[in-house]
Amino acid sequence: MGEKLICNNKKAFHDYFIEERFEAGMVLKGTEVKSLRMGKANLNDSFALVRDGEIFLHNLHINPYDFGNRQNHDPDRLRKLLMHKSEIEKLFGKIREKGYSVVPLRLYFKNGLAKVELGLAKGKKLYDKREDMKKKDQSREMAQALRERSKSH
């Protein structure tokens, strides 16, 4: 069946260095799955925390299902993630180190199951962000110059 992307967290790549990636399943309610299939989710400002050997996703906003009734889900509820115990322990060890956090990078369906890609992230300093922006600008200008040059010939 493959993968169907629901949403990306572009802000995470701007604010953090992503050192390692993990895939996790999510415990969801029926109306949340239907809302995700419609592509109504927001990963901005969300993060994952390990508590009592389990990992939870905070601030993931899934819009209420449009055709749901009064038993619709809470859009900002805490969602449990499903990972192997060894992966959770590895993440927990890294989170305890200063400067590391776990952020969701993208939300997608894989073979009909909702998955979230987590990134082990270290925060960028302001000068790192400026360097990244400079590199992007330079590559954009170079590509533009090449396009203009190829048009003139």
UniProtKB/Swiss-Prot annotation:
<feature type="region of interest" description="Disordered">
    <location>
        <begin position="129"/>
        <end position="153"/>
    </location>
</feature>
<keyword id="KW-0963">Cytoplasm</keyword>
<dbReference type="InterPro" id="IPR023620">
    <property type="entry name" value="SmpB"/>
</dbReference>
<comment type="similarity">
    <text>Belongs to the SmpB family.</text>
</comment>
<keyword id="KW-0694">RNA-binding</keyword>
<dbReference type="GO" id="GO:0070929">
    <property type="term" value="P:trans-translation"/>
</dbReference>
<dbReference type="Pfam" id="PF01668">
    <property type="entry name" value="SmpB"/>
</dbReference>
<comment type="function">
    <text>Required for rescue of stalled ribosomes mediated by trans-translation. Binds to transfer-messenger RNA (tmRNA), required for stable association of tmRNA with ribosomes. tmRNA and SmpB together mimic tRNA shape, replacing the anticodon stem-loop with SmpB. tmRNA is encoded by the ssrA gene; the 2 termini fold to resemble tRNA(Ala) and it encodes a 'tag peptide', a short internal open reading frame. During trans-translation Ala-aminoacylated tmRNA acts like a tRNA, entering the A-site of stalled ribosomes, displacing the stalled mRNA.</text>
</comment>
<dbReference type="InterPro" id="IPR020081">
    <property type="entry name" value="SsrA-bd_prot_CS"/>
</dbReference>
<dbReference type="GO" id="GO:0003723">
    <property type="term" value="F:RNA binding"/>
</dbReference>
<protein>
    <recommendedName>
        <fullName>SsrA-binding protein</fullName>
    </recommendedName>
</protein>
<dbReference type="InterPro" id="IPR000037">
    <property type="entry name" value="SsrA-bd_prot"/>
</dbReference>
<dbReference type="GO" id="GO:0005829">
    <property type="term" value="C:cytosol"/>
</dbReference>
